[in-house]
Amino acid sequence: MNVSIEIGLLVSAFLIFCSILMSKTGYRFGIPTLLMFLLAGMLFGTDGLGIQFDDVSVAQHIGMVALCIIPFTGGMDTKMEDIRPVLSPGVMLATSGVFLTTLFCGLFVYWVSGWQLHTGVGFTLIGSLLLAATMSSTDSASVFNILRSQQINLKHNLKPMLELESGSNDPMAYLLTIILIQCLQAGGVSGWEILWSFLLQFVVGIAGGYLLGRLSVWLINRVGLKNAELYSIMVLCFIFIIYCSVYLLKGNGYLAVYIAGMVIGNSRLFKKKEIGTFLDGMTWLLQIVMFLMLGLLVNPHEMLPVMLTAVLVSVFMTFVARPLSIWLSLLPFGRKITNKSKLFISWVGIRGAAPIIFATYPVMAQVDGASQIFNIVFFVTLISLLFQGMSLSWVARKLGLTEPLPEKEDNFGIELTEDVGSTLREVLCTEELLQRGRHIRELSLPEGTLVIMIKRGDRYIVPNGSLELMLGDRLLFMQHGCQHFIETLLGICAAIAFEQAARI
């Protein structure tokens, strides 16, 4: 049936709109937003309201675009000072953790395939490992979204470690998936070929991501565009240039865009705030489209025959394969990472869109059992998002790994672009501060430091040196540079609490 472009746009917009409304309902009950998008697609799909979508190729290509932009945005939001202490364990989790999860889970699937479950599910050893490989990585979109939407403040640098793992482990899962598909199609691949492929993918991916990221920063800061909105479009172009260039050089494009995102996000960048806002919007749109599309792609009635196998695999992966892989991967770090932290890392093995996208590769390659692989991976993803996603904050609290969120109230709504090179701090006027002086000129502020605005109740005051301060006033300081400013304020009063920090 031919559908006009107007009808197609109307249906697409309506689906996205309904998904957003469903996500609001799910948020009230603690259901992950991305799970609601997935369920919305299933509701409107073939077994629901009857919208037919069965083009695996289109789903794979849209997923590829999403898996370029989402990790790049996550990389831009990752601060090097946060991940530097957890860089080594994060890399171990993203490499050996994925490999061990594939090995343990693949052997379990092969063992289960020998059971007489009357489900029609049966895999060879390579096929079992392929199924495990497609879902061996945690999903960056799901982990970034859940950690940030639930506003969990984790101890022991766990949040940057988890975001580093989820942002950088897709390349390993992708590589294992491709190699195992080649093994099934060609009848075998030599060990040297596998080792060379691993080295080439990671070395070219890391080097290409870093070098092209540095080149992107240099070009953005020097191009001198008259229209500020074009900088965001330029960054979007760089994302795809980086991915495709590294891919053509036989490197891992997904790893490259994540590395490039970290390089760009941790550099002085013209219009960084505007670029970040644009990419955040793009990330949300792609997450909605990707999960909604994957929900439309699956036929729930086809998952019923594999349901028992999928549940067994999900339970084994969650409670055996993932924890065992985490413990073994983190052995070199001894007691630096506590057992409670390892337990929580094991629980945050959330599956999402990436495993489902990787499960489309066997379908496109037409390997034996590809449809079963896709349906099992989809079912495991549903279980993971539902149980692990919903219980994330509860598990963190039970393990004693949370701490109160720092207050981030913004009373002034003022942000500075990075090229200004100044720092804003919001400070509460306390008794201790008033003991140093009741007027601004008595505070002995260093050169270059100004009180640019005061909030008193509901009033905003542009102060001068003779203004008398009152208990409860909120002072907005501005100073060029950061460290000297912090030392100055600490010198004024050790009891002052910093409530707002904005340095872009």
Language model: regions and residue ranges:
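Transmembrane helical cores of multi-pass secondary ion antiporters/exchangers
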Residues: M1-E409, E418-D419
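Short beta-strands and strand-coil junctions in structured, solvent-facing domains, enriched
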Residues: T78-E81, F270, P300-H301, R436, ...
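Short, solvent-exposed amphipathic alpha-helical segments in soluble enzyme
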Residues: P362-V363, G400, L443-L445, E468, ...
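Charge-rich, low-aromatic oligomerization/scaffolding segments with amphipathic character
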Residues: A396, L471, H484-G491
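Long, charged amphipathic helices and adjacent flexible linkers at domain junctions
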Residues: P404-L424, I496-I504
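Cytosolic Rossmann-like ligand/nucleotide-binding regulatory domains
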Residues: L433-C482
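Short, compositionally biased
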Residues: L467, E487-I504
